[in-house]
A protein has these predicted regions:
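Soluble, acidic/polar mature domains that operate outside membranes
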Residues: 1-320
């Protein structure tokens, strides 16, 4: 498929693995759903009615200067050109001409939406997925309860005076820290409150709103505020599993660790962050809800407890 519209011009074709993708974006995730939606429309388009059997009065339908064209080559090597005109009156759809000098039809508005998309809309948006548990994880003795978790997170960026790091509590034998699921390890060793757990639970996967710019230049990164990121998250995920010893003690171990880095820049008008994720050479938009750590500071996640030691009794009280 070769598409030309008011904003972009690009080709969607099969790669060596017979997967459809935008030419030039071979190094980026593939927006499979969007591509299938486009090709589905192009392979089985149904018109609501025919307006004209010949190509006369094209300017009445906006087809003298089409908003978009799609040149499609099918598996049998046959070719068809679709030209998109104006929206039809009465919200009935849009005008489309099939091949030069061919008939003019009214088709659904969804078809117009597909042809007017920019190439970046066909870049995949699933950026981080949870590490997979072993298929035979029942062998751990947990009954198949191996779970993907956030193991460690380091936060930096211009929004913070110094890095903030926290992760899964590995000091459970220490009575001072044994009650915490997560511990702050930098800049101080402290227990965490509920907000740390909420951040950790949301960190095992990440989906973007959409891609904004493929293969950005240094100047474009600066435009999005990504030359000096506002907030940076260095993230380690892993599958957590529990095993029992001969003494009936539970031992926690981890496997299939994956590391990720997310850099946030400026916000768009809707409050989404421009972002770089891992080694993907593209700028994405991330909703603020998908990155709850974006502005998190030490005081936001530290435990509100004044005393970390497990004080269970009071020896005496003196009041003057």
């Amino acid at each position: 498929v070769e598409i030309k519209n008011e904003k972009d011009e690009f080709i969607i074709a099969q790669n060596d693995e017979k997967q459809l993708l935008v030419k030039g974006y071979e190094d980026l995730p593939v927006g499979t759903y969007e591509i299938e939606s486009l090709t589905g429309e192009l392979s089985s388009l149904t018109a609501s009615r025919e307006i004209s059997s010949d190509s006369v009065n094209l300017d009445d339908y906006g087809l003298d200067k089409p908003r978009a064209t799609a040149e499609v080559t099918y598996h049998d090597d046959s070719k068809i050109t679709f030209e998109l005109g104006n929206d039809a009156s009465g919200d009935a759809g849009c005008y489309v001409r099939i091949d030069k000098k061919g008939p003019i039809y009214v088709v659904n508005s969804y078809f117009a939406e597909q042809l007017l998309k920019e190439s970046v809309m066909y870049i995949g948006t699933s950026l981080i997925t949870p590490p997979e548990a072993r298929k035979d994880d029942t062998s751990s003795g947990t009954g198949g309860n191996d779970t993907a978790v956030m193991k460690n997170m380091k936060l930096s960026g211009t929004v913070r005076k110094e890095p903030l790091e926290f992760g899964v509590n590995t000091r459970t034998d220490d009575s001072v820290y044994s009650t915490f699921n997560y511990l702050i390890t930098s800049p101080l060793l402290k227990g965490t409150g509920d907000s740390a757990a909420n951040i950790a639970q949301s960190a095992t996967s990440l989906d973007a709103v959409r891609a904004v710019k493929a293969h950005p230049t240094a100047a474009q990164l600066k435009e999005y505020g990504l030359d000096k990121p506002y907030s940076v998250c260095e993230l380690t995920l892993a599958v957590q599993t529990f095993t029992s010893t001969d003494d009936d003690e539970t031992v926690t171990t981890y496997y299939n660790s994956t590391k990720h880095i997310i850099k946030l820049g400026k916000k768009d008008k809707d409050g989404n962050y421009y972002a770089l994720v891992d080694d993907y050479n593209a700028v994405y938009l991330l909703s603020s809800g998908s990155v709850p750590w974006a502005e998190t500071q030490f005081n936001d996640i530290v435990t509100p407890l004044l005393f970390l030691r497990d004080i269970t009794t009071v020896k005496s009280i003196e009041v003057n």
